[in-house]
A protein has these predicted regions:
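Conserved catalytic core of nucleotide polymerization and phosphodiester-bond processing enzymes
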Residues: 1-281
């Protein structure tokens, strides 16, 4: 429907209505139903719902509070710390791409992270063969879509839909990416091959994810299984790392008798309600 918005103004109005209706029903009205007598909202975290191992949140889902749109930011403002406290937000930057670099051993991707470069601009520079400082916003956006898409085993068709380009051009982006980072291609191929042989993948911490789809008699189901095999070790390891971080942060806060406390986990991000006098510690 989004593709029709430019040609038919009413479509844009319908999409805007849907967005506002979602914000109102799910957040403006929905969250108010979960406020307890203390004025707080408590979510429920689940360890075993997602296949990747990530924590999920329900009743209400506090991992999905909108942030990108201006109205979403206003909704976030209803959450505030206790008097004298403040929120400290810490996250693992580009954790899945960093894990891809580590697990594949691709020197170029590793070097880009070691130099603390804008990873999407770095990829665009290499894939499109232009100097780093001359990468355009469009080239960076395309490289970003490829960077994240590769982790999820994106197809040329899927990338073409994301970027609104032809399938042939999208395939060219993917081919150029693998020419730039050959060890990533090798890693993904080997990961899928091992998963087909064993029927499962492992995270770096040894957690197993069975992938029965790889032995399906249905071609589309097998393709889905291959995409799962590519992504599961990366996203699963990221999930393991953030859980370990949660334990370590909690234990240190207790051990050092801090008043600060861990109050929320949003995938690769931790939110701590921090006492003003403890914020530098």
């Amino acid at each position: 429907m989004e593709k029709l918005a430019g040609d038919y103004p009413i479509v844009a109005d319908i999409l805007e209505y849907r967005k506002l209706s979602k914000l109102k029903s799910t957040y403006a009205d929905g969250l108010s139903n979960f406020i307890d007598a203390t004025g707080k909202i408590h979510t429920t975290f689940h360890q075993t719902i997602t296949a990747t191992g990530r924590l999920s949140s329900t009743d209400p889902n506090l991992q999905n509070i909108p942030i990108r749109m201006e109205l979403g930011k206003m909704i976030r403002k209803v959450f505030h710390p206790m008097p004298g406290d403040l929120f400290v937000d810490s996250d693992y930057s580009q954790i899945e791409l960093r894990l891809l670099a580590h697990m594949s051993g691709d020197e170029q991707l590793i070097e880009a992270f070691r130099k603390n470069q804008d990873i999407h601009r770095s990829t665009a520079s290499k894939v499109f063969h232009v100097p780093f400082d001359e990468v355009t916003d469009l080239q960076r956006r395309n490289a970003k879509a490829v960077n994240f898409g590769i982790v999820y085993g994106i197809s040329a068709y899927g990338l073409s839909q994301d970027l609104n380009i032809g399938t042939k051009e999208a395939q060219g982006f993917i081919d150029s990416y693998f020419e730039t980072y050959p060890k990533i291609k090798e890693f993904l191929d080997n990961t899928v091959a091992q998963a087909k042989e064993k029927g499962y993948t492992r995270t770096l911490f040894g957690r197993i994810r069975p992938i029965p789809e790889l032995s399906s008699g249905n071609f589309m189901t097998r393709q889905f299984g291959e995409r799962v095999a590519m992504n599961a070790p990366i996203q699963g390891t990221a999930a393991d790392i953030i859980k370990i971080a949660m334990i370590r942060v909690h234990d240190r806060l207790i051990r050092e008798h801090f008043r600060s406390r861990l109050i929320l986990q949003v995938h690769d991000e931790l939110l701590i309600e921090t006492a003003e006098e403890e914020k530098e510690k």
